Regions:
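A generic structural motif
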Residues: 85-91, 132, 245-257, 315-326
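Glycine-rich phosphate-binding loops that contact phosphosugars or nucleotide phosphates
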Residues: 45, 52-194, 296
Length: 364
């Protein structure tokens, strides 16, 4: 059974500030500033040296923390048109060489496995772009060989999603594999943070409204495109970090193959009996499903979207492209930030985040 949130806290600014004594909402709202700081740090790290390189493979490393979410999002953004093979793995493969590019992120300066991977990749001549703290074994393994982008803004562990994504996208831009306007990305993240500011009440605050929709439910985060599904993975990560909600994440076609869960979703979004008494339910107490259909790419005629709209008429559709004019990477980042702030609002209201219970990686 999930913790019950105090919904009234979300619009009581004084109590919300008191609950957020660690300044977690402010840390999350620095996403746009992270993009700008990372852009400057990447230039100083010498990412331009990747220009003109035609890599044999791009290796995306998924170490614990943000690594899996970042890697899968970058892969999803690249996959439609990228001519270079993408490898998503927990450790750098033994076959990497001078024609390969390795992208890695960690909040843990003492990640021994990553340190060994970075050392091996650099020794074999691979081009390594690493986003990590500038002290500790991981940074030491990169010294003089890898391109180390150390975060310039101090945020708690797990709050550097914008830094990690920006670092990877800038590396891909240098390789000529992806186009990203970092300044526009930062500006849109600033706008989203402003829309979601604690001073705005729930009915005009997208993150608070999302938090209230998720409260006391089991979120089914079903993507209508690969990028949206990747953002759903990150949403599940932040919800598990700041709340005790358990989510299901899948692309919609895959979700349809989960027949029992999909049937429950159909029932939950079809209206049902609005006069039904929940006390008449004979079975174990359970949080009802809340179906959120996520869309990043603007494809109104897409088969998945049409099928989902017909099958799940009452599902919530969250599509940033219908709210802002931006590219896929920016829409994905905006959606990710909204989920992060929603998770924080929900966690603060339920008392499941803040204080000593937050994740802290091992120190060097």
């Amino acid at each position: 059974m999930t913790s019950l949130p105090d919904d009234s806290l979300l619009d009581d600014i004084a109590r919300l500030i008191d609950a957020d004594r660690d300044g977690l909402l402010r840390s999350a709202a620095l996403a746009g500033a992270q993009v700008r700081a990372t852009t400057d740090a990447a230039a100083e790290a010498g990412l331009d040296r990747l220009s003109g390189l035609r890599p044999r493979a791009i290796v995306l490393v998924t170490r614990p923390g943000l690594g899996p979410s970042v890697s899968h999002l970058i892969a999803a953004l690249l996959q439609p048109s990228c001519a270079v093979p993408l490898v998503v793995c927990d450790q750098v493969p033994n076959w990497v060489g001078p024609l390969d590019v390795v992208l890695a992120h960690t909040d843990d300066p003492g990640d021994v496995v990553l340190a060994e991977s970075i050392h091996r990749a650099s020794r074999f001549g691979a081009n390594v772009v690493l986003t990590a703290p500038e002290e500790g074994p991981v940074a030491a393994a990169a010294a003089g060989q890898a391109m180390l982008i150390a975060p310039r803004l101090v945020v708690p562990p797990g709050f550097g999603f914008a830094t990690a994504v920006t670092s990877g996208l800038l590396a891909l831009r240098a390789l000529g594999l992806f186009s990203v306007d970092a300044a526009a990305l930062a500006d849109e993240l600033d706008k989203e943070a402003e829309r979601d500011h604690m001073q705005h009440e729930s009915f005009v605050n997208p993150a608070k409204a999302l938090a209230l929709r998720l409260a006391e439910h089991t979120p089914l985060l079903w993507g209508l495109d690969h990028v949206a599904t990747a953002v759903g993975r990150y949403a599940a990560q932040v919800l598990a970090t700041h709340t005790d909600l358990v989510c299901d994440v899948a692309g919609y076609q895959q979700a349809m193959s989960r027949t029992a869960l999909h049937r429950a979703a159909v029932r939950a979004t079809s209206g049902g009996d609005i006069f039904a008494d929940p006390d008449d339910f004979d079975g174990p107490a359970a949080s009802p499903p809340r179906v959120l259909l996520l869309a990043v790419r603007s494809m109104p005629g897409d088969a998945s979207r049409l099928l989902a709209a017909e099958t799940l008429p009452g599902a919530d559709l969250i599509a940033p492209a219908e709210e802002i004019s931006a590219d896929d990477a920016t829409c994905a980042a905006v959606l990710a930030l909204r989920f992060e702030l929603a998770a924080l609002y929900l966690g603060l209201a339920a008392g499941t985040t803040g204080g000593t219970g937050r994740y802290a990686p091992a120190t060097a």
